[in-house]
Structures are given as C-alpha cells and as structure tokens.
Regions:
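Non-catalytic, usually N-terminal nucleic-acid engagement modules in DNA/RNA processing proteins
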Residues: 1-183, 296-299
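Glycine-rich nucleotide phosphate-binding loop and flanking beta-alpha elements
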Residues: 60-62, 94, 225, 276, ...
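Glycine- and acidic
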Residues: 148-152, 156, 216-222, 331-334
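Glycine-rich phosphate/ribose-binding loops and adjacent secondary-structure elements
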Residues: 163, 172, 176, 188-305
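Cysteine-cluster motifs in flexible loop/terminal segments that predominantly coordinate metals
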Residues: 287-335
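Conserved small/polar residues in nucleotide/adenosyl-binding loops
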Residues: 344-351
Length: 355
C-alpha cells in the first residue's frame, strides 16, 4: 500500500508498505542482477549503507542457478540472506535484447540461453511463475521493450500485445498467490508503460493500464537510445496519467542528475547498473562532480572519496590507497569504490548538488 506523504508540484514523498518492510520514496534500488551486487558487496554491506530495496533479474536467475532451486532454498530472501524488499524485473528486457536469438508470438517469446544456447520459452505466465518461485516482494509484468526508434506501427502492435500480456500476468499472479506452497503469497505486481518515443501511444497505454488497479506502475523503454531531453519529455507527458496514489518506477535510469529530474516529474523508484559498473573501474560520482581514480593527481590524495560520506570505505580509506588497489587489480579496490557510489546514489534525491 502506498501512502502519499507530501507533494510539491509533481514531486512526491511517500511510503510503500510491503510484506518485507516499508519503503520510503523516492528510492534508488541497488542492482544485484544474479542476487549479488558486483564488486564483492554483501547484503550486510547493503544494510550498513542504508539500502531499502534490492533488484534482481528474473531471466538470469532462471538460467542460473534456476528459480526452482531458489524456491527449494526458501526463496530469494533466504537464499541471499536479505530481509528487506526485493524487486525482480520480468526478464523481458534481457529477452528482447537478444535480437538475433528470439522469436516473438502472442503466447510469448522463444529464445536461446546466452550461457549454453538451449531453447527457452517465456511468456506472461512463465515470467510470473519464475518470479513466484523467487518469492520477490515486487514482480514486474512481462512486456516487450521496443527499440526507441522503432517504426510506429511496430510499436503500436507491441504495446497492444504488452497490454494483453499484462492482463495475463495479473490473472496468473492472483492464481499463484493463492497456492499453498507459494513462497510469498503477498507478492505485488507492477505494470509497465511502453511506447518508445511516441508520446500519444504512451499516453493511451498509460490510461489503459491505470484502469487495472495494479500495485504500482513503471515507465519502461527509456534510456535505450533516446536523448535525455526526449526521456524527460516523455515523463512530462506520461506520468500525469499514472495514479498519483501508487508508486511510479522509472526503469533502468539512475544517474544523480536523472534521479533529480525524475523526482521532479513524480517518479518514486529508480534503478541503474552504471553507478556500480563505473565505480568498479574507478569512475565515481561525488558531490563535487565525477572523479577518475586512475588519474595521477590522486596518487598522494589523503582524502576519502567523498568528504562526509557515511560508508565504510570513506570512513577509513584514502583516495590514494584505493587508487593503488585498483592499479594493482586487487578486488578490494573495486569493493571500496562500489560502496561510496552506492551510498551516494541512495541519497541522490536529497540534494540538488549534482545539477
């Protein structure tokens, strides 16, 4: 259940109550694709830096180790020792990114595993079943993420199919949540708005899915080739048609500047792999801009990565030391970069310093 605490313009502050705890929004979700944050960051670390929600990937966990194995282990929360909310994406983005390896039909998508090439079929029901086996707090509906510059007719047909798939997801989740052996009988469902860069298609789709009384709504298919200006324009046009009394999630977007722009437009949830991916390579966001620890000027820099940061890395280690670890290819160097960048992103919506 979502409670709107305060609203200024379109910007919202809210509380989203789930079976695994209350989420204060706006919120940035740390991305643990295969149930772990890359860079040797543990769930204990996530708790220490104040992570509210972790995001894992349905497709990757289905392929390895297998969602049925995770169910036998008691669900994803027990498997990764994390007691707070988890959001699982539907696997759709990964499936549709395998352009040469998949075939789309009304029933779903047939594609080949990126690991060993074996054939996999995934449709709305299969995606819901996998996410039910994982037992995540929030499950995302199965959708098609059409390329941002795709032909208008293709996008229109894709969106209509995505709407039908959402209806099937809703029916299947209701069935799965009623089963005696389900891992999480209180699993929530978010629908996804699509439509590439065609604002009229997106607006009509937003109106249709808003009528379905879902637990939350996402704006998908952005940050996949369009400009920032196009993305912000789509948000300006679409978000007003999504229910203000439900959380809004901007999928795959999460630089500090993007977060602030999204919050201003009424977005509650964000996620992005780039902060930790860049951090593992020594490229970090700070309150004073981006830094590259491989630059020679940090060789004798005794300051922490971020002055005043509460993460373990900044509380104890210097830029010079972390730079040394990165150049020596020590795993600890990646870890000590990922911690502060994660800490910073968890709080990016609290400050305008990045703009």
């Amino acid at each position: 259940m979502y409670r709107l605490i305060k609203q200024e313009g379109r910007a919202k502050r809210g509380e989203f109550t789930t079976v695994h705890g209350v989420i204060q929004t706006p919120v940035f979700m740390n991305v643990g694709t295969v149930a772990a944050i890359k860079g040797a960051v543990s769930t204990a670390d996530l708790e220490q830096i104040g992570t509210q929600v972790e995001l894992s990937n349905t497709y990757h966990l289905h392929v390895r180790p297998g969602d049925r194995i995770i169910k036998q282990m008691g669900g994803l929360h027990k498997f990764m020792s994390w007691n707070k909310p988890i959001l699982t994406d539907s696997g759709g983005f990964q499936v549709f990114s395998l352009a040469g390896l998949r075939k789309i039909k009304e029933e779903g998508v047939t594609f080949r595993s990126h690991i060993d090439g074996h054939k996999i079929f995934m449709g709305p029901e299969e995606s819901m079943q996998i996410q039910s086996n994982l037992g995540s707090t929030i499950a995302m509906a199965f959708d098609e993420c059409a390329p941002s510059k795709a032909d208008r007719m293709y996008v229109q047909n894709s969106v209509e199919r995505t709407t039908r798939w959402l209806q099937r997801c809703q029916v299947e989740m209701k069935r799965l949540n009623s089963l005696e052996d389900t891992v999480n009988p209180h699993q929530l469902l978010f629908g996804i708005n699509q439509g590439a860069i065609y604002e009229d298609i997106r607006i009509e789709h937003a109106k249709r899915i808003a009528e379905m009384d879902l637990d939350g709504y996402a704006v998908g298919g952005l940050a996949v080739g369009e400009t920032h200006e196009e993305m912000y324009h789509i948000l300006d046009e679409v978000v007003p048609y999504l229910p203000v009394n439900k959380p809004t999630y901007l999928m795959g977007v999460g630089t500090p500047a993007n977060i602030l722009e999204g919050v201003e437009r009424g977005v509650d949830f964000f996620d992005c792999v780039y902060p930790t991916r860049n951090g593992r390579h020594g490229h970090l966001y700070t309150n004073h801009g981006k830094i590259n620890l491989f630059n020679a000027k940090y060789e004798l820099d005794s300051r922490p990565i971020e002055e005043g940061c509460g993460c373990p890395a900044c509380q104890r280690y210097s830029r010079a030391y972390i730079r040394h670890l990165l150049k020596a290819k020590e795993m600890l160097g990646m870890r000590l970069c990922v911690l502060p960048v994660s800490y910073t992103h968890l709080r990016a919506h609290e400050t305008g310093a990045y703009l």
